[in-house]
């Protein structure tokens, strides 16, 4: 897939509509997860990491071990999907992880936890979608226990290799096994919507445009 082309051509609504038409009705995350900037677009393949809330931190234990391993292993166009079970006191993402990920040409980060260093990340224009913003470190509060294992975010199943697309409207997760079909159909729907838009701009009635294309 040409992720740069998809990033500039697709949008979350058309992917959601495509999934609906195929019978996948629960692939959109709730509105609680937002981009750090409305212009950010998340487009890539998931790498899932699962955090566990902790109540005691032994200084002899490296709580960052698996987190570092996951981030350092990111490939171009991959999205770090960090699952904190909506514990907003866990902030798994910040400026330094963004810096490393951007160097690796990763596509961004998606988390239901918190993110910090927001000012710097916005300046970097690195796509980050998060459930909350806060200054807390994940140390003493959470630890990444597993990665590249099945997970769930806001009730939506997610696996490493799934296609992640997010924009100002929301985030959609496309299962890996249907990604190629969904992308093809979504691109076709974009072309059809462009035709309908042109018709409406030239005075064609909404009823006529819908009758001809079935798109609204």
Residues covered by each model-derived region:
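Channel- or pocket-lining gating/hinge segments that regulate access to a cavity or pore
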Residues: 170-172
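Acidic and generally charged, gly/proline-rich low-complexity regions
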Residues: 163-166
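Feature captures the catalytic cores and cofactor-binding loops of soluble hydro-lyases/lyases
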Residues: 1-160, 174-216
């Amino acid at each position: 897939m040409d992720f740069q082309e998809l990033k500039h051509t697709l949008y979350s609504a058309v992917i959601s509509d495509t999934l609906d038409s195929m019978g996948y009705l629960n692939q959109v995350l709730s509105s609680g997860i937002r981009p750090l900037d409305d212009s950010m677009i998340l487009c890539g393949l998931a790498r899932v990491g699962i955090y566990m809330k902790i109540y005691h931190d032994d200084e002899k234990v490296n709580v960052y071990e698996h987190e570092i391993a996951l981030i350092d292993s990111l490939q171009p166009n991959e999205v770090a999907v960090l699952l904190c079970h909506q514990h907003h006191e866990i902030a798994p993402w910040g400026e330094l992880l963004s810096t490393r990920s951007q160097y690796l040409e990763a596509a961004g980060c998606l988390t239901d936890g918190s993110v910090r260093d927001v000012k710097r990340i916005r300046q970097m224009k690195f796509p980050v979608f998060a459930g909350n913003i806060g200054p807390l470190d994940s140390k003493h509060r959470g630890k990444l226990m597993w990665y590249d294992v099945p997970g769930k975010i806001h009730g939506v199943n997610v696996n490493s290799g799934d296609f992640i697309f997010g924009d100002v409207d929301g985030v959609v997760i496309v299962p890996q096994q249907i990604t190629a079909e969904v992308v093809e159909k979504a691109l076709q729907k974009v072309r059809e919507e462009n035709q309908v838009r042109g018709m409406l701009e030239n005075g064609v009635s909404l009823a006529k445009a819908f009758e001809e294309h079935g798109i609204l």
